[in-house]
Amino acid sequence: MGSSFGKLFRISTFGESHGGGVGVIVDGCPPRLKLDLEAIQADLDRRRPGQSRITTPRKEADQVEILSGLLDGVTLGTPIAMVVRNKDQRPQDYKDMEVAFRPSHADATYQVKYGIQARSGGGRASARETIGRVAAGAIARQLLKQANGTEVIAWVKQIHDLEASVDPSSVTPEQVEGNIVRCPDAGMAEQMIQRIEAIGQEGDSCGGVIECVVRKASTGLGMPVFDKLEADLAKAVMSLPATKGFEIGSGFAGTLLKGSAHNDAFLPTQDGTLHTATNYSGGIQGGISNGEPILIRVAFKPTATIRKEQQTINAAGEATTLSAKGRHDPCVLPRAVPMVEAMVSLVLADHLLRQQGQCSLW
């Protein structure tokens, strides 16, 4: 339970970090969608470990195998199964963690809930679970692009206390991929890289914020009350490992404004589409997209598994210390960028199909 997401465009992920592999089944993808298989692999390459000096040194090719649902690269409308085999496991690095709970990790809560857990590699709590999400999200992104020209672009907005200045209206994927931290602000990116390296050398970790914009989103996506678009986006990105906060549009800063300043005034347009003078709403009003860019921010905590010695307890509840071995990211944000893009794309693809099914018959 808890490994499936979506209603019409639905995914189910499977696998553990140190098991045979991880993957996903995508159910509900429309037929006759021509897929760029290299684009799926490209997104997985952006997520994979060992890609730079500021990520975990674990070496995985993360080569995706597509087992079903396609004919000559075109979707059949049947379930699409994708798997990535694990190659570079080192379970010996987790010996100490078999008897001591990692502070702020899922070790203790998984043990309390299930009475058993895959300690090696973190099991389902490992970020390797997100491989399936990124692969499925790459399909969703292609569906959105082909259907409406929709673009989903995320980037690192903040690392520790270093915040970048980025214009969401003009940022490009090339700017995001222009450096290893995936921050379009080149000057700030270098400072971020230095900060991550310095904190990592201390045996510690740091967190930050990822920002994501959706351009050319369809108008009318989202449902009233419980299935509001921003609510589903929040659930989607907050289901990613290490997430601790979500904002849309003006977010918490909007609480400092008066209504007269915060309201997005509607402007007349020649084609009759909705357009606003400002976008404090973040592209969503009443839980439904209004056609303006959707802008969200996601906060990620510092990586829980660190080399610095920490106080903890063992499975018997006895006090002990833990200095985690293994290969872990000093900061998850550079690799989390494609994860955020994937989850946003999955939500939008699901709501696009729901919108078409409910409101496009006549």
Curated annotation (Swiss-Prot):
Molecular function GO labels: chorismate synthase activity; FMN binding
GO biological process: amino acid biosynthetic process; aromatic amino acid family biosynthetic process; chorismate biosynthetic process
Pfam families: Chorismate_synt (PF01264)
Gene3D superfamilies: Chorismate synthase AroC
Catalysed reaction, written as an equation: 5-O-(1-carboxyvinyl)-3-phosphoshikimate = chorismate + phosphate
Annotated residues for binding of NADP(+): 47, 53
Domain of life assignment: Bacteria
Cofactors (names): FMNH2
NCBIfam families (UniProt xref): aroC, PRK05382.1
Summary of the function given for this chain in its UniProt record: This reaction introduces a second double bond into the aromatic ring system.
Name of the featured protein: Chorismate synthase
Gene source species: Synechococcus sp. (strain CC9311)
